Amino acid sequence: MTKANPFAALKWLSLAPALLLGGCDMTLFNPKGQVGMDERTLIITATLLMLIVVIPVIVMTLAFAWKYRASNTQAEYKPDWHHSNRIEAVVWLVPCVIIAILGWITWESTHKLDPYRPLDSEVKPVTIQAVSLDWKWLFIYPEQGIATVNEIAFPKDTPVNFQITSDSVMNSFFIPQLGSQIYSMAGMMTKLHLIANEEGVFDGISANYSGGGFSGMRFKAIATSEQGFQDWVAKVKAAPASLSIGTYPELVKPSENVPPTYFSSVSPELFGHILTKYEHHGDAKGAAHGEHAGAEHEAAMTGHDMQDMDMQAMQGMKDMKDMHMQPSTQE
């Protein structure tokens, strides 16, 4: 009877990660927009440059461990060896050259891929104002006069200028197949410029944890033809609901897994209202603090004046007492 090898199953278990990872979609390495393609090139280039150092180190570590193993009595032993100009040149020169190249690439790509930098194109861009809520995305099209929740559309080969803010905690706006992510924060506006090189439906996500409904805070980004975009706008304008500053408080209430929702019209001032209401809140707090501080200062000054008056009164009483106690000169 042969004994079962407890390690025999490990070689089959080692295939499990490959099988599981086979179902994963490498979204970042399958970009559908120019910004995403440039970022993929940057990631691959930087990784290959670093592998110039990493791979030789791994190979030499394994080679030296094998060559100088205890059973290899033929390996040359040099106990007095301590320096080599060639080795010093390689271990210093190669990393320095790689760092210099990476530095140049970083400088160039940082400016080229700046999310605030408008994309070079002769086509008029589409402007979309994005607001992160709990737990959904509100999108306003100021030029078309419409708004949506958890769905956007735009023509392919057309720059899309996103103006992003938050009406809740800090969040992050991200369409992985199109390019960069950018944070959304209450009381301030961030910008992002993207473009789709082909038609398709791309997943948009929140890339920053924001509470219980975070996992369902997803939206669809539809890149279509110019005619397809106009048809989509017409469909939204046919929706029965509208969005105004008065009805907005109902929308902003926390909700999870919200389906795409259309608003046929939207108040032109809504995005500005969302953007500035936290600034006014800060001003009000500052004014209240100033009034409180002024009241404290006035009370302190009043108390100080009263203390001075009390001291003067006590001094006057002391002087009168001294006068009564002095003997008369006639006596």
Swiss-Prot record:
Q: Lipidation annotated as N-palmitoyl cysteine: which positions?
A: C24
Which stretches of this protein does UniProt put in the Periplasmic compartment?
24-41, 108-331
**GO cellular component terms listed in the entry, alphabetical order:** plasma membrane
Q: What UniProt keywords apply to this chain's record, in alphabetical order?
A: Cell inner membrane, Cell membrane, Electron transport, Lipoprotein, Membrane, Oxidoreductase, Palmitate, Respiratory chain, Signal, Transmembrane, Transmembrane helix, Transport
- Say which domain of life the source belongs to: Bacteria
Q: Specify the protein's topology with respect to the membrane.
A: Multi-pass membrane protein
Biological process per Gene Ontology, one example term: ATP synthesis coupled electron transport
Q: What Gene Ontology molecular-function terms does this entry list?
A: copper ion binding; cytochrome bo3 ubiquinol oxidase activity; cytochrome-c oxidase activity; oxidoreductase activity, acting on diphenols and related substances as donors, oxygen as acceptor
Q: Where are the transmembrane segments?
A: 42-62, 87-107
Q: Where is the lipid attached (S-diacylglycerol cysteine)?
A: C24
Q: Which residues lie on this side of the membrane: Cytoplasmic?
A: 63-86
Tell me the first and last residues of the signal peptide.
1-23
Annotated InterPro entries: CcO_II, CcO_II-like_C, COX_ARM, Cupredoxin, CuRO_UO_II, Cyt_c_oxidase_su2_TM_dom, Cyt_c_oxidase_su2_TM_sf, Cyt_o_ubiquinol_oxidase_su2
Name its cellular compartments. Cell inner membrane
Whom does it interact with, and what assembly results?
Heterooctamer of two A chains, two B chains, two C chains and two D chains.
* Entry similarity comment: Belongs to the cytochrome c oxidase subunit 2 family.
Record's function text: Cytochrome bo(3) ubiquinol terminal oxidase is the component of the aerobic respiratory chain of E.coli that predominates when cells are grown at high aeration. Has proton pump activity across the membrane in addition to electron transfer, pumping 2 protons/electron.
> PANTHER family, alphabetically?
CYTOCHROME BO(3) UBIQUINOL OXIDASE SUBUNIT 2, CYTOCHROME C OXIDASE, SUBUNIT II
> Which protein, by its recorded name, is this?
Cytochrome bo(3) ubiquinol oxidase subunit 2
Organism of derivation: Pseudomonas aeruginosa (strain ATCC 15692 / DSM 22644 / CIP 104116 / JCM 14847 / LMG 12228 / 1C / PRS 101 / PAO1)
Q: From which lineage does this chain's organism come?
A: Bacteria, Pseudomonadati, Pseudomonadota, Gammaproteobacteria, Pseudomonadales
